[in-house]
């Protein structure tokens, strides 16, 4: 079985297909072209996911599920991006839209949390129970793993660093 991971960023949408050994077997990218309606961006995410699957020499029938890492405050239970400044999303129903477009089970998480979990499962933090990951892209984010689980805080903004004041009025 194969899995698709999508990195939804303020500049680019990147998709990767991995196998059960966490090996990336296909990729595809496109520009995000913000600001645009959530429906248009989801259509592009679905297209890029299908392109990555095709580039891997596979079909969507071989894909078990799709995981999306998105900037900002993400509610993984409701599968909604509550707020993402660089996408201009406010309570965007990304999970529901992507499920309709792809027919696959959708998982969604803050991008930095997803990166932190990926590092804990298959990357630099593999074998640890606690780790911190800082992401730098269109924005700045952070993900924390405590006891092998993602820490996201009570409001899903757990370790988001993008709005940390360094210089007052700066």
PLM regions with names:
Residues 34, 38-46, 50, 62-66, ...:
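Glycine-rich phosphate-binding loop and adjoining helix at the ATP-binding site
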Residues 11, 112-113, 157:
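A generic "binding-loop/recognition-motif" signal
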Residues 2, 16-18, 26-29, 37-40, ...:
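Glycine/GP-enriched mid-protein hinge/lid loop-to-helix segment characteristic of carbohydrate kinases
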Residues 11, 71-74, 137-139:
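Short glycine-rich anion-binding loops that position phosphate/pyrophosphate groups of nucleotides
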Residues 22, 83-87, 150:
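Glycine-rich, phosphate-binding/catalytic loops in enzymes
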Residues 4-8, 12-70:
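Conserved phosphate-binding loops in N-terminal lobes of ATP-dependent enzymes
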